[in-house]
Amino acid sequence: MRGVSVCFTRTQLMRMFPAVLSCALTLLAGLAQAQQPMPATPSAQAGSQMQAATPSQVPVAFAAAPLPGGSTRAATLRELGIDYEITLRGVQGSAGVPFSVRSDEIVTAATLNLKYSYSPSLLPDLSHLKVTINGVTVATLPTDKANAGKLLSADLPIDPRLVTDYNQLNLQLIGHYTRDCEDPDHSSLWANVDAATSLSLTTTPLALANNLALLPVPFFDMRDTRRLELPFYFPQRPDTATLQAAGTVASWFGSLAGYRGAVFPASTEALPASGNAVVFATPGTLPAQFATADSGVADIRGPTVAVLANPNDRNGKLLLVLGRNSEDLQRAATALALRAPLTGAVARIGDISAPAPRRPYDAPSWVSSERPVRFGDLVTQPSQLNVAGYHPDLIRIGLQLPPDLFVWKRDGIPVALNYRYTLPEQDNKSALNVSINESFLTTLPLTGRPFAQSTPMRWWNSLGTRGSMPVHQDLTLPVGAFSANSQLRFHFFFDRPQGEACKNTFPDVSGAIDADSTIDLSGFHHYMAMPNLAAFANAGYPFTRLADLSESTIVLPDNPGDQDLSNVLTLLGHFGASTGYPALHAQIIGAGAVQQHAGRDLLLLGSAESQPLFKQWRAHLPIGQDGQATRFALTDWLFERLPRFLSFDARRTDLPTTAEIALQPQPDDVLLMGFESPLKSGRSVVAFQTEDPANMSRLFDAWFDPTLLKDFQGSVVLLQQNNVTSLVGNQTYYVGHLPLPTWLRWYFSHHPVWLAFTVVLLALLLALAARVLLRRRTAERLNDGGGA
């Protein structure tokens, strides 16, 4: 086994000490067996084809036993961000899988459960699969003929000393199919890595200092790709103002969690027995464990933020948000959410400059609709826009669009694309493929000139200099391919040049999307038919129209319990994940104060008994208590007496209506409803109705599952067990604004009979006006003639 020389800093050595000690003990225990061959690692069968493969060059000492108190978790490739099956092609095809380790953990054992298959054409004595961690080889897997084409499984122990904070797991195929001259890109040179491949890490906690400068660590760690679960503790039942402060903090953590999702279990009984948590307290409610002078927080004289050890768990931390009253709590929460500079274990909050009021649709996570947006502003690292090699990965750009873009009579969304690439020596099949999510858009040949479909434009482009970089291309992205969270994908395909026999050296190739490329939504208005629960589930709309939720109010049920508090915090975290900004101005009230919030969008929680507004607004709900639809009298009259295309209802028609399905809600069901606010037209209400607030956790799970999230549509969603049923109600209203000429064109295009009626009416009015005018002129002429 070849030695590896590695240099470490003092901090790294301290982090690795438990792992080094564990490996040393295991090595001593294994010396007696050093001369014996390593047994094949047992592996689970995958159908009838899954077999266990024995890797070579895997040191036995690396398979260290977990330390006491350690925890083990496994993550599949999908959970690590690879949502597709990896295919390795060519003589040296490779693929990388990044993974990271939390700041408050150290790895004591690691195992890669690799599920793979390879081509039957590979020569066993010249070919193998190589697995590396951060550039260090940890295993090589043979490609014997007996197992070729089968789905194999191998458990590969990894030396935990190789695992750092940020890591790169690399899989490489060294493949050859002949001993003579070979095509390095031959179709028989392949190996597949199954998406079920998983990485298992055993970790032990690492003590961190009580230092606010580390925030949001350890309460949220960007290196952790799992869903964030952060408990909130209130020493007594919080009032609405205290809950608003907690909501600000929850929405901040939700904005940090982003795609991971976040849930916030709430408790008013006791501090969490283990792990990290957030605590809200005033002098009268401060837990006894922190009432001593040495805690540093016993004397609360104003807004205060502190990080202290969890008295129930030496490895856990508590984030304390303290104040003399609820106003102080809100100031402390705002300081946290706005990332005010904090250091030490305890920080007293002084004056905080109020942030500027948010404008509609200016959420940091949304593509701005006020100006063209650079691609460089839509990625976290400039390197994400660059690729190299003949089998490059996709360039992915996330696009979170406002859900109410008015795209009627528009060809699509304009993109000014600038891209660079290694120019082929001669014209070939090299191309840049563009797609949105899974929908193919276009192919741009890599000829050194912009692509044009019309003959005159191709002739014009041919007059330009070939190979001038960057190449500029105007694209129009069809709006039908977009979802609330879309991905614009670019794939550079480089065609290998035809070389001479046995001369297979090819030039290095690379491609890049210029960071100054732009997408422009500034020409679109905002106007949408409501209710639209797809927009709510995916983007929190209409509440997130203003990123700070300054026009949104959450209405609690009577006597809310811990689970109700948790649901409120999780919803605000969901809104923060959508906007990328904390909900600084969301209001939380009881049903009795709803009249004072008539001009705001409302979010209702509770059961038919605990939420009084469900009874007060029964006539306005899209579905009644008996499961039947409710309509306004005028709408009934129109549906009964006029053709459907004359109706004001321009909703989508591919969903069943609430009148067409007899619902029989069960106690475990969750009913999600959207309707226009009875208090003010143009304002929206979204209501969650369930007998047990704990059922809401299943709805949140559905939101985090893309296969279920897409089923949230229409104005009513019924969650029964794990089934999502979407219905469309019979009331439609519109939010947003259109210029009058645009609104008239849109309205009459959807209601041709009303257009005809309006034209006839205008013709009659013009005829009447002309008749009156002509009679007046005739009378004047007769009067003039009589006077003569």
UniProtKB/Swiss-Prot annotation:
Gene3D superfamilies the UniProt entry points to: Galactose-binding domain-like
Intervals, Cytoplasmic compartment: 774-788
Any Pfam family matching the protein: BcsB
Subcellular location: Cell inner membrane
Gene Ontology biological process terms in this record: cellulose biosynthetic process; UDP-alpha-D-glucose metabolic process
Transmembrane spans: 753-773
Signal peptide: 1-34
S-S pairs: none
Keyword NAD (UniProt): no
InterPro entries in the cross-refs: Cell_synth_B, Cell_synthase_bac
GO cellular component: plasma membrane
Pathway assigned in UniProt: Glycan metabolism; bacterial cellulose biosynthesis
Periplasmic domain ranges by topology: 35-752
Membrane topology: Single-pass type I membrane protein
Keyword DNA-binding: no
Keyword annotations of the record: c-di-GMP, Cell inner membrane, Cell membrane, Cellulose biosynthesis, Membrane, Signal, Transmembrane, Transmembrane helix
Major localization listed first in the record, in broad terms: membrane
Subunit structure: Tightly associated with the cellulose synthase catalytic subunit.
Record function comment: Binds the cellulose synthase activator, bis-(3'-5') cyclic diguanylic acid (c-di-GMP).
Family note: Belongs to the AcsB/BcsB family.
PANTHER family listed in its UniProt record: CYCLIC DI-GMP-BINDING PROTEIN (PTHR39083:SF1)
Record-given protein name: Cyclic di-GMP-binding protein
